[in-house]
A protein has these predicted regions:
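Structural signature of tandem-repeat unit edges
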Residues: 1-13, 23-36, 45-59, 68-83, ...
């Protein structure tokens, strides 16, 4: 049962449907090397509450968090992830 994921540096892409349907996943911390998050990457993760997205991320598919309504994005102010959160009405916290 995957509850928390902390990625090591070196990971650059979170692929399509990578964590789709992980229904107990609560927290994800992406590596500082991640650049993109694919379609449905975190789809149907109802317990996902926190995802830490670094400034290095410059692409997030519009459906990356589809049907994961409880997620809050933690990201630096002015980052692409912040803009994505605002545009998609996803709660976010600057850090």
């Amino acid at each position: 049962q995957l509850i928390e994921v902390t990625m090591e540096d070196g990971v650059e892409v979170i692929g399509e449907s990578a964590f789709k349907g992980c229904d107990v996943l609560e927290k994800v911390t992406l590596a500082s090397t991640v650049q993109s998050i694919g379609s449905d990457a975190f789809r149907e993760c109802p317990k996902l509450k926190e995802i830490f997205i670094p400034e290095s991320v410059t692409e997030i598919d519009p459906y990356a968090f589809y049907m994961s309504e409880n997620v809050t994005i933690y990201t630096p102010a002015g980052s692409y992830a912040e803009s994505f959160a605002i545009e998609n009405n996803i709660p976010y916290v600057n850090q």
